[in-house]
Amino acid sequence: MLSKNSTIKKLDDDYYNIENKKATIPSLFYEVNEIIFKEGKPNSDLDKAISIALWLKKNIKGGKGLSLASEEALKAMINGNGGVCSDMSQIFNNFCVINDIKVREWGITMIPFDKKYGGHSTNEIFSKELNKWVLIDVSKSILFYYEKKREPLSLFEVYTSNFSHNYYTFLEKNIDDVQIQNYYYNKKASPFLISKYNNSIYDKYLKSLDTKFPVFVIHFFIYLSGKSYSYKFPLNDYKNMFR
């Protein structure tokens, strides 16, 4: 089963860097990282993460979804050949790894499922300075906070705040995006952690089989091999999705 119920506590030590070490990240990410931080790196984890997210937002116009190995996906996105929120989240993961930032990738769906919402991808990074996980939506360029406290919020804080949270952008001007309302201010919105995603394994299969099989077949091969990722739902019972 790809989907599993979990708890907030059980996910404390579940993050992308466990499966993906710096030495396994493709070389193009290191080359682009030099460009991102050509003026030097900020000191804090959150400021480094924001710098990465800002560069990606300013240099990737987005477009169609990509089903490519990570290095090919990054190349395509930089060249203006597509990229949706999940593509942005996935390449952000790799930049965080090479900058020694703990990172997680989350999907957001509706429970019960509602086909008018297409789903969304976002990230969390662990800030050593704040000693907490911080939700950062790379494709929307936003963080979240409580009205009277400017400390950025974790994903769990956002989804258990009873909509008392606000968001702010780290772009030049604030944005009003209907998807922000749909996925962060909606009682049906349910986050799930993408757990145990091994970038090297998916890169290997996608590179060797992408001209021979559809992407969903490649993912099924990986699932049969026992090396697939899973979706972990800490706040809602995923079994209610189609009831």
Language model segments and positions:
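Alpha-helical and coiled-coil interaction segments, frequently adjacent to or embedded
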Residues: 153-243
